[in-house]
């Protein structure tokens, strides 16, 4: 939205849909817009998109224009952890952001996830010694985040432990099954 803080700081460029009735993303239009506008970052994420995103296709587009690839997985993080939804990092994305509540079933909070020692995709490897996680850490702490709440950290650890259990896969499958039932009702 144009009045948000991020809209005042950044120039967001949107891509179209194949069909307004279905709301399906037009990846060809996304490609054309990326070639035209040469974005520094492509953000893939959604709250109300009822389909799986084609992370590989988005990664191909982003790699061609040299953009950082970031996926907002807040609504589907538990489905990814449960193995029923694709992990954007496996398709070539550099960064994922998520909440720790919603489908992860933890306390309110957030995460920024990278592939470990990923290089800075905005610079040639021989021209930088800083990797992407270091750059993100420097921007987030201490300016935006500091003074951790140990009770929240402990609660998140419990939620992450639960997400590693076999029963969590059953939960993720049931979420998908329930969603499909609601969609056909």
Positions of the model-derived regions?
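Conserved PLP-enzyme active-site core in the AAT-like
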Residues: 1-185
